[in-house]
């Protein structure tokens, strides 16, 4: 059979046994990739600093997904939250990876078995003796089983009734840990940032799936609907399955990029909107002001800011700063964060406190402008020194650090002040190690960006696939070139072509 590459899947079109076989083999490949990728990531992952070098800075992709489902310990003796452990149990990162690889091997063997033993009785229609599948019944079975899995996940795994729970954190990604979740049955359950909605929605959707599955197992579709939607054609199944997949891909691309309870910032990094809105900056200032209200000094107030919170307020952790074709982890870009230098506060010779205007997300370069509390420009680093009025030298800007490694240190020489003003454009200032990984200083995206880009791209491709296969199954007779006024009853055989002498026909 001389098939072109884009039509090779027609070999399983009317062969249920081998159709099942190739799907099992596909599952083997997916599971094998997941397990192998997990082992690779574990081989290169450095768990020593969960605050300044978390998994998302290291470009980990599958470790965050395992972690959000409750895996936190490694057979290597470390925990994702820091510290050492003695008894990680079987469901460690390596245990989950191994289970996927074992499952992949079993699926591989099952796929071979079904390829060899393709002509099973279960695939034969008793009336005709030909291979056929009762697709509406199979739909009911799959709906029922997926409903059971969905309900079980929400009612047992997430709630901790039989399972670890899921990763839950505070709004600023500081206190995350795996814990059981109670379902949220009120309006708050529809808030995408409320973890309880994950439990309640899985329970509700699972219940609906079980009931819908039982319905489709016990009720046959009407003949007109069966014919209108081509329910007897396997390509209808392909088209509707692709629709389900691309819809899910669009949804998860959204929940990942905009953030939700399912994509914690401790595991996937912050979102770009948290930088755009000054989300962490506002919380830092709120905490500092609260400290000052308790009669703490400026230095003491800033010293109480956790490094983790300060690190989120750094543009290098913004997933939108990485280019699409800049391969590698964030650590390969601006380097491995070593420590927080502290918060710089700039002042001019008149005593005004100055704030450096921060770089917007989609700028690579941005003018250094310092404004006072009223937004009035007081100082800058001019492009043309001959026309400058507000240069650091003319205005007499000084900088003093509060909190961090440089706490209490001040500088008044213009070159140093300008250096820290440029760095303050990028948020809180960190010492970054570029030597270890030979980092090039160009920002990279986090796994949040890669996941979103990948799923949005494939969702678009799968959307066209749904249209393509849906059109093929709905207009199959048109594409085959059949005259609608044909007065002969044609039975489509192997070739399904009009004028083919092997196609049986009967004059009406």
Swiss-Prot record:
* Keyword Plastid appears in the UniProt entry: yes
Read off the NCBIfam families from this record: PS_II_CP47
Coiled-coil annotated residue ranges, if any: none
Q: What is this protein called?
A: Photosystem II CP47 reaction center protein
Q: Which Gene3D superfamilies does its entry note?
A: Photosystem II CP47 reaction center protein
Q: Which PANTHER family match?
A: PHOTOSYSTEM II CP43 REACTION CENTER PROTEIN
Q: Where are the transmembrane segments?
A: 21-36, 101-115, 140-156, 203-218, 237-252, 457-472
Report any one BP term from Gene Ontology.
Answer: photosynthetic electron transport in photosystem II
Q: Which superkingdom does the taxonomy of this entry point to?
A: Eukaryota
Instruction: Extract the GO molecular function terms from the UniProt entry.
Output: chlorophyll binding; electron transporter, transferring electrons within the cyclic electron transport pathway of photosynthesis activity
Please report which protein family the annotation says this sequence is part of.
Answer: Belongs to the PsbB/PsbC family. PsbB subfamily.
Q: What is its main location?
A: plastid
Membrane topology label = Multi-pass membrane protein
Q: Note the SUPFAM superfamilies from the entry.
A: Photosystem II antenna protein-like
Query: Which keywords annotate this record?
Result: Chlorophyll, Chloroplast, Chromophore, Membrane, Photosynthesis, Photosystem II, Plastid, Thylakoid, Transmembrane, Transmembrane helix
Please describe what this protein does: One of the components of the core complex of photosystem II (PSII). It binds chlorophyll and helps catalyze the primary light-induced photochemical processes of PSII. PSII is a light-driven water:plastoquinone oxidoreductase, using light energy to abstract electrons from H(2)O, generating O(2) and a proton gradient subsequently used for ATP formation.
Kindly state what the record says about how the cofactor is bound: Binds multiple chlorophylls. PSII binds additional chlorophylls, carotenoids and specific lipids.
Record-level GO cellular component terms: chloroplast thylakoid membrane; photosystem II
Q: How does it assemble?
A: PSII is composed of 1 copy each of membrane proteins PsbA, PsbB, PsbC, PsbD, PsbE, PsbF, PsbH, PsbI, PsbJ, PsbK, PsbL, PsbM, PsbT, PsbX, PsbY, PsbZ, Psb30/Ycf12, at least 3 peripheral proteins of the oxygen-evolving complex and a large number of cofactors. It forms dimeric complexes.
